[in-house]
Curated annotation (Swiss-Prot):
Interacts with tRNA. It comes from Mus musculus. Residues 43-83 form a coiled coil. One of its GO terms (molecular function) is tRNA (guanosine(9)-N1)-methyltransferase activity. Disulfide bonds: none annotated. It catalyses: guanosine(9) in tRNA + S-adenosyl-L-methionine = N(1)-methylguanosine(9) in tRNA + S-adenosyl-L-homocysteine + H(+). This is tRNA methyltransferase 10 homolog A. The modification Phosphoserine is found at residue 22. Residues 1-91, 281-328 are annotated as: Disordered. S-adenosyl-L-methionine-dependent guanine N(1)-methyltransferase that catalyzes the formation of N(1)-methylguanine at position 9 (m1G9) in tRNAs. Probably not able to catalyze formation of N(1)-methyladenine at position 9 (m1A9) in tRNAs. Residues 52-62, 305-319 have a biased composition (Basic and acidic residues). Residues 88-278 form the SAM-dependent MTase TRM10-type domain.
């Protein structure tokens, strides 16, 4: 009788579950995403565990950024309370201006639809605002300004004509800055930027939705015979999403680096949390095949993604719809 019951008991789901976790084989158990999914390897499981740990620390990182903003705000108030009445000018005089030139190249105007032009406009607004409040503001250039971008700014942001501490030019950057001073920031460059030379002018491609024009900024840099480089993102960060940085991502990372002289701190202060960024030294080791499966290199162009919590009020487009916070 017992021999007849034995096959039925072996086929029981409960017994199968116990067998799968017995004899020290817990580590060999292969979790599945769903009933029809492929089994997950131990290495992939380890990566998922690392990511889970990173996600669990999300609030802690968010609080740290909030505390940093509060501390800076308190420092400004203390400066103002100790001033002689000319508070704002007093604070601005304490800023250590950088001689580094940061250029947004707007020569891709005819390659973008109006929706992307509006995104670029918002990113430029963010760059301007961040540079105005930075401890080490850069010499900000907006070149090849015209076409759809200028028209959109005229219609939706007429105050841009009164912007201060910015050079808005219709000329191409190659007509304004010496060739030997230029460095184009592009993900396709084989050169990795290790430090910033404040005598140089770093160019950011003002191109939204660059996936339709892959390698365009690199081709432009080589055609003009100027230096090119990419930020050392891969040395400090591993991301589980597309490695695409918006214009103001790049701009703000450079501002942060000028203040901290720490690339990793700059990346993790600026990069949006939803990109799943993890410090490179904390990410588990992966095989060359894993690297090949990662998304292709980041670029200074964007798809209108937003970064850290934006303290500024959201902008509205022509239809009166609230847009995402600006970044890049």
């Amino acid at each position: 009788m017992s021999s007849e019951m034995l096959p039925a008991s072996i086929e029981s789901p409960n017994v199968e579950e116990k067998l799968g976790t017995s004899d020290g084989e817990e580590e060999r158990q292969e979790p599945r995403v769903d009933a029809g999914a492929e089994p997950i390897s131990k290495r992939q499981l380890k990566k998922l565990m690392k990511q889970k740990q990173w996600e669990e620390q999300r609030e802690q990182r968010k609080e740290k950024r909030k505390e940093k903003r509060k501390r800076k705000k308190l420092e400004r108030r203390q400066l103002e309370s100790n001033s002689d009445g000319n508070d704002r000018k007093r604070v601005r005089r304490d800023v250590a201006r950088s001689s580094l030139r940061l250029v947004i190249d707007c020569s891709f105007d005819d390659l973008m639809v109006l929706k992307d032009i509006k995104k670029l406009h918002k990113q430029i607004q963010r760059c301007y605002a961040e540079n105005r409040r930075a401890s080490h503001p850069v010499q900000f250039y907006l070149t090849s300004h015209g076409g759809q971008l200028k028209k959109n700014m005229d219609e939706n942001d007429q105050g841009w004509v009164n912007w201060k501490d910015i050079h808005i030019k219709s000329e191409h950057y190659s007509e304004l800055i010496k060739k030997e001073d230029l460095v184009y920031l592009t993900s396709d460059s084989p050169n990795v930027l290790k430090d910033l030379d404040e005598s140089k002018a770093y160019v950011i491609g003002g191109l939204v939705d660059h996936s339709h024009h892959k390698g365009l900024t690199f081709k432009q840099a080589t055609s003009y015979g100027i230096e090119h480089a990419q930020l050392p993102l891969a040395d400090f960060v591993k991301m589980n999403s597309r490695k695409v940085l918006a214009v103001n991502h790049v701009f703000e990372i450079i501002l942060e680096f000028l203040e901290t002289r720490d690339w990793q701190e700059a990346f993790f202060t600026i990069l949006p949390q939803r990109k799943g960024a993890v410090p490179a030294h904390k990410a588990c080791e992966s095989s060359p095949q894993d690297h090949q499966s990662l998304p292709e290199g980041w670029d200074s162009a964007s798809e209108g993604e937003s970064c850290r919590d934006n303290p500024d009020s959201p902008q509205k487009d022509e239809q009166g719809q609230q847009s995402s916070p600006v970044l890049q």
